Amino acid sequence: KKSDASSKKVEITNVSYDPTRELYAEYNKIFQKHWKEKAGQDVSIIQSHGGSGKQALEVANGLQADVVTLALEGDVDAIKDAGLIDDGYVNEFERDSSPYTSSIVFLVRKGNPKKILDWSDLLRNDVGVITPNPKTSGGARWNYLAAWAYADKLYNGDETQIEAFIKKLYENVLVLDSGARGATTS
């Protein structure tokens, strides 16, 4: 909910996809402190989380949101198609990319006994991978794209080698969960 600049309190709603719940709970505390110092206002942040596509549909159908942080460009496009975001928003970003980033984190066993440091390590025969399915999870598509970008840089854009890299990576997948939250508990 918007407030005028003279108000000492402001409330915003962030509609986001499910795995970001804990991230934004922590980030909001940092933002609240920053906003108080910058604008002199106390900010209350309401979080709404669910599947990215469902959240996009909710916003397109009238759920009030000051900020949307969704998993996929197609979900943002659904909001654009409802007239809530300007056409051509992707042109503002390098390579017409999505206006959102995601950090990929490798969770390893305590002490990292297999010394996994980057994507190439996930291709070793002694490594098993647990990841969500990119056909069903927005976060998994970020994983896929991050692996592709790593291989693209490693192989100087040679698509044959990049595809072989991705194929080998997915051959090492032990659990291909339907969603990011499930993959973190597998």
Language model features with spans:
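Short N-terminal or domain-adjacent regulatory/targeting segments
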Residues: 1-4, 113-115
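Early extracytoplasmic/lumenal segment of secretory-pathway proteins
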Residues: 2-82, 92-93
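Second-shell loop/turn segments in exported
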Residues: 10-14, 58, 129-137, 170-175
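Extracytoplasmic/secreted envelope proteins and their assembly/folding machinery
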Residues: 21-28, 32, 52-56, 60, ...
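Sec/Tat-exported extracytoplasmic proteins
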Residues: 27, 31-39, 63, 72, ...
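Short, surface-exposed, polar/charged, turn-prone segments marking secondary-structure boundaries
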Residues: 40-45, 72-77, 95-99, 133-136, ...
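A conserved helix-loop-strand patch within extracytoplasmic ligand-binding domains
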Residues: 80-153
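Ligand-binding pocket segment of bilobal, Venus flytrap-like solute-binding proteins
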Residues: 154-186
